[in-house]
Amino acid sequence: MEPSNYYSDQDVEKCVTVGETVLSDHPDIDLIICPDSTALPGQLEAAQKKDLTKDDVTITGFATPNAIKPYCEAGALYNWGLWDCKVQGALGCYLAYYLASGNDVAVGDVIDVPGMGLVEILPNDCLVPGAPTAEVNNGVVLLPERIIFTAENVDDYDF
């Protein structure tokens, strides 16, 4: 599959259309990993329009639990993920405090975040090697965990 043919530009309506195209162009497809939080509900909507369930094609990606809950309840997918907003907020606040306290950071540094553990400052291009950035390797921190949502735990979250 050529990815540029199926990207929906994070446009909600286009996501459904792109999802329908993927399913039509590849009727024997077994797995679809959606690239963004609008693509996942769009792809699931497209699958439902074709009366497909998680037993017909595995669809997953990242999106909020509230956006995907109806599809989960309908049996359209097994699981999906997203970063934990509380962990993301806590990490961002602590790193802001850490920097405001006069600490400098550089790629390769490891910071002990209370209640979270060690996080490392990674090069900007750690996810996409060679990707252009405004400053070379000024650093990023990846979240240490993500939430995996399932039919069993989706009701535990409201966002």
Which sequence ranges carry the predicted segments?
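A residue-level marker of the well-folded mature domains of exported/periplasmic proteins
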Residues: M1-F159
